[in-house]
């Protein structure tokens, strides 16, 4: 949280405060695990793709083509299949196709949904990112995966730092694809891996996928950013809490 807060403040004038997401995630990876590329497991693929997505978002900062959102969604779906490839190869063809298509669709929807928030107020993206990260991390943690839970919670706390700056200053803080793309990729892949390798029930993913859509579609009152953020938080956190609750009903208590 603190690293993300500092990063958002430092890069605010350059309109790159969205780098707070990858900064908060990277420091969590450094502290929570001894990261190496070999063997290239699904969890390590999440880290690698998260870092690559941040770099890609930085390169695409000045590009505003409409077709780009669809291209990024397709790339996100392909990244999901690559991440869970080894696990899918151990399943029957029917299960492999079903899980592969489901994971690809989930990540693609998150990438598309978070990218659509770029056309709205930055407050919507920050609120959706906070709820999506906390919902994914909390559900993964309850679903018996402490490391995946830390990944999601790191995203949520980093987005919360971004949101806090807007609430305290009562001013919008630019997000950009450096915020939305890494968050969607990491949260999406974390959810997919938690479903396949842990005890996260698959039907929590559609609930989490509605968070960016809800933040995009909900009408906001014509009032201060603080009031608008409370409205967004109530809606998005309700969905995140629903995903965590459903996971708890299946998996039981949080593993110690």
Which positions does each model-derived feature cover?
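C-terminal transmembrane helix-loop-helix hairpin of multi-pass membrane proteins
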Residues: 1, 149-156, 163-256
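N-terminal topogenic module of multi-pass integral membrane proteins
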Residues: 1-119, 217-256
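Generic multipass alpha-helical transmembrane bundles of integral membrane proteins
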Residues: 73-196
């Amino acid at each position: 949280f603190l690293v993300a807060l500092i990063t958002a403040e430092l890069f605010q004038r350059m309109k790159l405060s969205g780098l707070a997401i990858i900064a908060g995630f990277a420091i969590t990876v450094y502290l929570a695990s001894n990261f190496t590329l070999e063997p290239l497991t699904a969890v390590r693929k999440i880290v690698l793709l998260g870092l690559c997505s941040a770099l890609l978002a930085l390169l695409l900062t000045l590009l505003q083509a409409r077709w780009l959102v669809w291209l990024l969604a397709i790339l996100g779906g392909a990244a999901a299949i690559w991440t869970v490839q080894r696990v899918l190869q151990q399943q029957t063809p029917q299960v492999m196709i079903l899980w592969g298509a489901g994971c690809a669709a989930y990540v693609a929807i998150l990438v598309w949904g978070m990218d659509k928030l770029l056309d709205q107020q930055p407050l919507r993206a920050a609120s959706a990112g906070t709820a999506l990260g906390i919902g994914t991390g909390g559900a993964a943690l309850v679903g018996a995966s402490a490391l995946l839970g830390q990944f999601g919670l790191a995203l949520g706390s980093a987005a919360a730092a971004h949101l806090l700056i807007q609430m305290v200053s009562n001013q919008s803080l630019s997000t950009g694809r450096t915020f939305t793309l890494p968050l969607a990729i990491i949260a999406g892949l974390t959810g997919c891996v938690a479903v396949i390798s842990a005890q996260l029930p698959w039907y929590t993913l559609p609930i989490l996928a509605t968070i960016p859509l809800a933040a995009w579609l909900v009408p906001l009152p014509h009032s201060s950013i603080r009031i608008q953020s409370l409205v967004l938080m109530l809606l998005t956190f309700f969905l995140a809490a629903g995903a965590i609750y459903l996971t708890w009903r299946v998996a039981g208590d949080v593993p110690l």
